[in-house]
């Protein structure tokens, strides 16, 4: 159920957090019940498309890098058994980072092939995996990181096509490979997530510097990958006839505008509380919340500090925009009876 992928909440629905006792990705019964209900709708749609029935689904991954998160084997067993009950017959896999033996082994499970996620150092990392899984199982890189994602305020990540092709060659000498990513994508709307430890969220584009760009353009990385793969298997030439069109839309003239504070009563309903409410408290999964407070009974406030914001914060003082931040925000010389909004 958890996919990471820099997708909002790793693909888990926000409403799970309305349970103040919620424990994710473990044997917490309300979480397992939600997973089972979700799978009961999703899996029957996938079962007919498994490769043993003429379809394209060749493997099913139980979790995603679970060894980094926990070691609840009973939870992984629940996923495995539930999927089997619902008709999954193709092999199961797990995926973790080979560079950490404890974390890799925490994600392993009987009845599932352990695979590794990596972007370089195939000889050493596959060597580590061989120690963990023994001599009789195939080696596979489930996520070959041939690029990387971008966060707001950072430089765009790119990787050398030549170096990426060399890493691919080293992987194919030793085992099997699944590209992450083969084609770049887009996390529209509020669906882009945030990497653990990062101060800013990820951008809408998930181009990833992949072999095929976000809009399907062929890159030098694609051409070099094709040459490497041709060393290990026959590649049939396919004419690439689809024209990928790009267009410059030029300037757009804005003929009218309004501001948030003049239309608040038309787009939302106020909720009053003596303390800040979370999005889960008011049943809002996505979008924005406007928090407002008045500073009272103090002649002068030298500084107000906002701490612990879990996401992007835009702050206004008396209706005027002040600051955007992802961390602590400070204000100086705010006087009594003035309104602070964020």
Where are these regions (language model features)?
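Extended carbohydrate-recognition surfaces in non-catalytic/accessory domains of CAZymes
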Residues: 194, 206, 217-220, 227-302
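Substrate-binding cleft/loops of secretory-pathway carbohydrate-active enzymes
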Residues: 68-82, 88, 97-129, 189-193
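Catalytic-core region of carbohydrate-active enzymes that cleave or remodel glycosidic bonds
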Residues: 121-211
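Active-site mouth of glycoside hydrolases
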Residues: 1-89
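The substrate-binding groove and active-site-proximal loops of carbohydrate-active enzymes
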Residues: 19-35, 62-71, 117-118, 147-161, ...
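Conserved small/polar residues in nucleotide/adenosyl-binding loops
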Residues: 332-339
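Aromatic-lined ligand-binding clefts that engage carbohydrates, nucleic acids, or primary amines
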Residues: 301-317
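A cross-kingdom feature marking solvent-exposed beta-strand/loop segments within repeated
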Residues: 316, 321-331
């Amino acid at each position: 159920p958890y996919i990471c992928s820099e997708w909002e909440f790793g693909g888990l629905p926000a409403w799970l957090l309305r349970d103040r006792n919620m424990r994710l990705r473990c044997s917490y019964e309300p979480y397992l019940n939600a997973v089972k209900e979700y799978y009961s709708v999703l899996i029957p749609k996938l079962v007919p498309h498994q490769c043993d029935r003429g379809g394209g689904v060749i493997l099913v991954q139980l979790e995603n890098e679970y060894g980094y998160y926990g070691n609840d084997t009973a939870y992984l067993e629940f996923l495995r058994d539930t999927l089997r009950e619902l008709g999954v017959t193709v092999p199961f896999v797990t995926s973790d980072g080979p560079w950490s033996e404890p974390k890799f082994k925490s994600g392993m499970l009987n009845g599932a092939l352990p695979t590794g996620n990596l972007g370089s150092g195939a000889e050493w990392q596959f060597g580590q995996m061989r120690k963990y899984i023994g001599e009789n199982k195939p080696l596979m890189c489930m996520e070959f990181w041939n690029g990387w994602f971008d966060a707001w305020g950072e430089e765009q990540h790119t990787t050398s096509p030549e170096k990426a092709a060399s890493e691919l060659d080293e992987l194919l000498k030793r085992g099997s490979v699944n590209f992450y990513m083969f084609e770049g994508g887009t996390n529209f709307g509020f669906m882009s997530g945030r990497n653990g430890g990062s101060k800013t969220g990820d951008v809408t584009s998930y181009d990833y510097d992949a072999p095929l760009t976000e809009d399907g353009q062929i890159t030098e990385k694609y051409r070099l990958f094709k040459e490497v793969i041709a060393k290990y298997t026959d590649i049939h030439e396919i004419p690439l006839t689809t024209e990928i069109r790009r267009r410059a839309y030029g300037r757009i003239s804005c003929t009218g505008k309004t501001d948030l504070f003049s239309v608040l009563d038309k787009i939302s309903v106020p909720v009053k509380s003596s303390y800040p409410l979370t999005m889960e408290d008011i049943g809002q999964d996505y979008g924005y919340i406007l928090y407002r407070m008045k500073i009272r009974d103090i002649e002068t406030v030298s500084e107000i500090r906002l701490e612990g914001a879990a996401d992007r914060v835009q702050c206004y003082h008396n209706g005027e925009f002040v600051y955007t931040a992802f961390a602590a925000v400070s204000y100086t010389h705010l006087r009594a009876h003035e309104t602070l909004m964020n």
